[in-house]
Amino acid sequence: MTDSDSGTAAEIEITADLVRDLLREQHPDLAELAVREVAGGWDNQQWRLGDELAVRMPRTERAPELQRKECRWLPHLAPRLPLPVPRPVRVGEPSARFPKRWTIMTWVPGEPLDRTSISRGDHAADTLADFLGALHVAAPAEAPGVVDRGAHPGTYTEGFDHFFRSVALDGRADEVRAVWDDAVAAPAWEDRPVWVHGDLHPANVVVSGGTLSGVIDFGDLFAGDPAWDLAAAWVVLPRGGAARFFDAYAHADGAAIRRARGLAALKSLFLMLMGQNGDRGLPGGKPAWGPAGRAALDRVLSTDGR
């Protein structure tokens, strides 16, 4: 996605000097902390601020709204979650120097999983189960609802088909299709909507000491079907982790596991496509995501559902 209006954030080069100038204008007490760019996500460019903070600068049209969502709900969710998550500290308002809202968040220590690996698989499975068990509670009526993700897998067949056609599946296409078709055939979530992170994949979890140590990027947070997060049993955890995860999580019935496994296949194909785009030098491509996606898909296909 790109901005099309003159003077929008996407057309402004975000540099360390700009970040520091904005801090001097709006948060001068933080302006002398060290500033360095670190890996960001789809929607935000990220700058480390000192040792404990991060500045998130929007680079897509939807990013400011996602930041508002995080600022609204993370203070409510974070205190009861068993892993560190970003917490909003300050807000930067639109100005002549930068036309969009930006935020200062706490920094979650650790290395993103797309740049490292989990060596303590059982511990990571238990940790993820504890985290999602704490997150997946009934959400209030005013919680953000389903937008571009969160509905039943059958709603996303067009997207699945696009990813499916775009990557090489090395003779496993029929297996992948069967997993997806089973998810589409699974009964829908009919309980009360629960809080769902919505975007759990290797770039949005961090690792320390060989296990999960934090979860980041809650911009896609919504209230809905927890299967969207349960897919992380295959997308995030190493081989063998899914069975232990579901035993520890203990709240997923067979239909939820079927939906989650199909969504894990969908997410794996997406990671593979983004890796492929990165290898080809295309905009938005992420070379490190290709191997992560292929490994995740192998885990999806190497299990009978658990």
Enumerate the language-model features and the residues they cover.
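Active-site Asp-x-Gly
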Residues: 62-65, 193-196, 201-261
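ATP-dependent phospho-/nucleotidyl transfer catalytic cores
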Residues: 116, 163-194
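Helix-rich C-terminal or lid/interface subdomains of diverse kinases
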Residues: 220, 232-306
